[in-house]
Amino acid sequence: MEQIIIFFFALTSFFGIENNIIAADKTTVTIHPQNQQIEIVQEELFAIIRSEADLNLAREKWAGVSAMTTSDATWPQALDGFTTKTLSLASLDSQIQPQLTLTYSDEQALRAMGVWYDAKKKQFSVNHVPHDNLQTEDGKLVGNYWVFYGDKTFSFTLEPFKQMPEKYQQLKQPLNQVLAEI
């Protein structure tokens, strides 16, 4: 089984944009098996800025992400298994909060996100990676996997940057601050 895909916390990876300079401190993933839908909400977006070039790159990447809110957006091939893909950008407490909604017709499509479905057990699972800081009230940790019942909505939150090395903490800038400087 693969690790939870970087899609969940590196915003630009949803769109096949290389150089994941924009990420989220907190990502909440909610899967609605009854509706065959997955929602991914990212909070506290930031960029690692070492130079003016990084600042410009972050702004350029954000412009690319913003363009993905249109209906004719081009999505990466890894998301081909999802029948509907929608990105919306909300503002909450002066923070930009992307919400990605994906619809699937086959649970196997979730593998692209590192979420696995066992039809015999009617359970979903994701790898337990301690540094991802996965939190949930809906699943249970069984060995190296978080396991969730496959017949009801469940969610989990990831905070993979909680233990970010100090040298990167000093370079971390909230995305709204990066964009405000334009």
Write out the residue ranges for each language-model feature.
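N-terminal, post-signal-peptide region of Sec/Tat-exported proteins
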Residues: 43-76
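Primarily extracytoplasmic ectodomains and periplasmic/lumenal surface modules that are beta-strand-rich
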Residues: 33-39, 44-52, 106-109
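Amphipathic hydrophobic-ligand
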Residues: 20-25
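Hydrophobic/aromatic beta-strand elements that line small-molecule binding cavities or substrate pockets
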Residues: 26-30
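Sec-dependent N-terminal signal peptides
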Residues: 4-13
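Mature, soluble, non-transmembrane domains
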Residues: 73-182
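C-terminal segment of classical bacterial N-terminal signal peptides
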Residues: 14-18
